[in-house]
Amino acid sequence: MENGLCSIQARELDEFICDYLFPDTTFLTELRADIDSISAFLKERCFQGAAHPVRVSRVVMGGSYDEHTALKGKSEAKMVLFFNNLTSFEEQLKRRGEFVEEIQKHLCQLQQEKPFKVKFEVQSSEEPNSRSLSFKLSSPELQQEVEFDVQPAYDVLYELRNNTYAEPQFYNKVYAQLIHECTTLEKEGDFSICFTDLHQNFMRYRAPKLWNLIRLVKHWYQLCKEKLREPLPPQYALELLTVYVWEHSNKNQEKVTTAKNFRTFLELVAYYKNLRIYWTWYYDFRHQEVCAYLCRQLKKARPLILDPADPTRNVAGSDLQAWDLLAKEAQTWMQSSCFRNCDMSFVPTWDLSPERQECAFQ
């Protein structure tokens, strides 16, 4: 579909997204029904009758599985099983293998026991003693599939699960615990899955036009993966860059267009070496421990894109070669016809700094 995106003009981008990138609604409806069945089954069966008190407290979905940012064709998502009666992030780390084995056992049972609206396949890893687990829900007729990465997690936010306010004062104690354990264990960024609720809330009430822009970015990312066949930066880092662009454009009085936002996103990718982006939705500089840690984080090597729900995780990763490859593609794409106006001039980019300016230190 690269030729399709390259052959249109800027004013046609929104139509392209609606016509070619939206997933089939029938598939999404059936997918949600099957996800509900799988979640209920695992919550009921995992560790049923076990002597220890650990049970699945809830199941939370993450990633691109719903109507907001799912793509036509293939998407990736997460199913997070939160376990209660754990006391630390370290305990999650130590018992991960046990949890994955238990979940896999019941997923395989479920595959045999229940009918599904779409095709259900448990993915088995080729590596012995693997600690990863996934399953796929697909419809060959509709050429749609979603692969789910299944993750067990410490339910550190259980008491705050119904909190709808993005206020750091509610979460500072949790983040202080996270920072202490992560730095002690040298596992910074390894527990971001525990904050899946916050990842979802970060995106939940955004404008549909942002979701469509993210769809376009994910489509572009897939085209780059198919062409380059080399490791690329994490997709989530690009989604957060898209949010950063959108937030800036939303503050302006000028007319906001998909082409201008997309081209600005590509410009940020091209200048990745300067990226330092973070949000203060759930953590900020008012808590002493969290503030000290954030100041250290924000002085680290770039690109730096902090997970909005986990200050210990640099979503940009550390593979500079991957960023360099994608940056070159971004520079090429900035000259594409999909950024040309009717008079053949290029759509301008926003005057947007690759560094978030509101910083608590100098």
Swiss-Prot record:
One Pfam family matching this protein: OAS1_C
Domain of life: Eukaryota
Tissue: Expressed at highest level in brain with lesser amounts in spleen, kidney, stomach, liver, intestine, ovary, skin and testis. Not detected in lung, thymus, heart and uterus.
Induction trigger: By interferon (IFN) and polyinosinic:polycytidylic acid (poly I:C).
Record keywords: RNA-binding
GO molecular function, one term: nucleotidyltransferase activity
Listed SUPFAM superfamilies: Nucleotidyltransferase (SSF81301), PAP/OAS1 substrate-binding domain (SSF81631)
Role this protein plays: Does not have 2'-5'-OAS activity, but can bind double-stranded RNA.
Sequence similarity: Belongs to the 2-5A synthase family.
The protein's name: Inactive 2'-5' oligoadenylate synthetase 1C
Species assigned in the record: Mus musculus (Mouse)
Organism phylogeny: Eukaryota, Metazoa, Chordata, Craniata, Vertebrata
